[in-house]
From Swiss-Prot:
Region described as Disordered: 255-278
Family: Belongs to the RRP1 family.
Protein name: Ribosomal RNA-processing protein 1
Domain of life: Eukaryota
Amino acid sequence: METSNFVKQLSSNNRKTRVNALEALKKYLTAKQFKENKQIEFNKLWKGLYYAMWFSDRPRPQQRLANELGELHGLYFDPKDNSTADELTTNDKAFIKFSRGFWKVMCFEWFNIDRYRLDKYLLLIRRVLFSQLKYLQSRNWDKKLVDEYIKKVLRWLPLSGSPKVYTGIPIHIVDILLDEWERLLKDGDEDDEDEENKEEEMRKIAESAKKTPLADVIAIFQDIVADYNNSKVLREKIKEDLFSDTRLVSWDILEGETQHNDSSNESEEEEEEEWKGF
């Protein structure tokens, strides 16, 4: 696939050109030869998709492209894979490599994104995170797959706590994680104005959330907070905006009062001890 021409076509304002490029991309992604490629080929592909987003310069095409790029993860889902137990399928392995490719490119290119382009990349991250979680859900939250995703995707880079990852990325994940998880669990119906129906929907979401590996994902953030070497800004953001979210309590992911309130004081004490004087 010729990357430069492909990028221009995918970011084109001409609908027909854009649709044709997208269809060609889908065929390329699902070809057996590509799925079995090494990680570097997935990274190269995402570098091209990153620039397709870069050159998309109108609001509606940007939103549409963010949706389309996110939905590419779903191409690797095959219902037949749900009958395969205790091993990752070829599709699962391709999904992991495709997911890693996205986060690698985003984390390493983040410093180059100017303020005029920032919003569309924040939207892209939101759409991609949702689609990655959607794939896991489609695979019935297969434990081996979820563990692989957490270890080789989330903990590997975007939520590694590494100083090489600009804090804007994990902070954005903190902002969107529970909203996207809740969207994943909704039936897809339009918002109902009836208060009783809303309460019933919230009960259903809470019950569904308990059956997901959300606690395993939250554990990543707990580890980040527990490590005082990680960014104080990020740790405070996690405690204030994620751990304090009432949904985690209503979904039985966290207890009402966690020890993270205490760890805030401990964190401050440790950082005071690190002061070297004049």
